[in-house]
């Protein structure tokens, strides 16, 4: 039976997290803040706890405010153990908003 089961590939077994890019100042590295809701141990109220992860961004595509999915990987440096898998949602940029306003005024 175990032979008949499909084996998951190693990269499918790794953890995936979704978070917001808070810093992109380093080359090929972004800092991603991941929020999670945790119940208070005594009172039971859900509290939002956040943690920051350094993630590898090979092509420097991520910008501050982007919502990204990151995947656990082998250690790439002292603090980097995550890789950006994909950008789920781009953050709006002031330049983009100005261009949209100018296009709207021209019409």
From Swiss-Prot:
What Gene3D superfamilies has UniProt attached to this entry? Nucleic acid-binding proteins
GO terms for MF: rRNA binding; structural constituent of ribosome
GO annotation, biological process: translation
A single Gene Ontology CC annotation of this entry is:
cytosolic small ribosomal subunit
Cross-referenced InterPro entries, in alphabetical order? NA-bd_OB-fold, Ribosomal_uS17, Ribosomal_uS17_bact/chlr, Ribosomal_uS17_CS
Described purpose of this protein according to its UniProt entry: One of the primary rRNA binding proteins, it binds specifically to the 5'-end of 16S ribosomal RNA.
Among HAMAP family, the record links this protein to: Ribosomal_uS17_B
Cite the record's note on assembly: Part of the 30S ribosomal subunit.
Q: What is this protein called?
A: Small ribosomal subunit protein uS17
Organism source for this protein? Answer: Aquifex aeolicus (strain VF5)
């Amino acid at each position: 039976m175990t032979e008949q089961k499909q084996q998951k590939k190693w990269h499918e077994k790794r953890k995936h997290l979704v978070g917001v890019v808070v810093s992109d100042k380093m080359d090929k590295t972004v800092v991603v803040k991941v929020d999670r809701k945790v119940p208070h141990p005594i009172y039971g109220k859900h509290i939002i706890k956040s943690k920051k992860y350094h993630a590898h961004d090979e092509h420097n595509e991520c910008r501050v405010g982007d919502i990204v999915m990151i995947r656990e990987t082998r250690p790439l440096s002292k603090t980097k153990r995550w890789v950006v898998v994909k950008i789920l949602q781009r953050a709006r940029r002031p330049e983009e908003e100005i261009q949209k306003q100018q296009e709207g005024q021209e019409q």
